[in-house]
């Protein structure tokens, strides 16, 4: 039923990430090594925000210890990786809500365990529920 929608969403997200990656490659050369690794982790998280990422796995990909990655990530982004990922998921969810997706579908596509989990994070971050947000946007 939603297969075509999911595929088109996946392809548009992939195209967006590829364009960002090409732009960021030029900028990355000028960054310190630790910051380049943090940017790479951000790109990995952004490429699959619906997935549950493990800190040890991300650290291994960029050649850092989990503890060092955690410190460096927070230093350069202001948030630990999980909090950054939740914020990224919420930004993605706003886009999907504006496109007319149902709240339960948005929760699933953005990697929240269920609609209630999504609503809690949404309200904590934005001060209203997704339904209230949609009611005020219309």
Model-derived features: where do they sit?
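Terminal helix-turn-helix DNA-binding modules in bacterial transcription factors
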Residues: 42-47, 52-56, 75-115, 119, ...
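Short, charged alpha-helical segments
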Residues: 5-8, 117, 121
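Short, basic/aromatic-enriched C-terminal tail that caps enzymatic domains
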Residues: 127-136
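Intrinsic low-complexity/disordered segments
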Residues: 4, 65, 112-114
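Alpha-helical residues within the helix-turn-helix
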Residues: 60, 71, 75, 108-109, ...
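Short, Lys/Arg-enriched, Trp-marked, Pro/Gly-tolerant hinge/linker segments that flank
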Residues: 1-7, 11-62, 75-83, 87
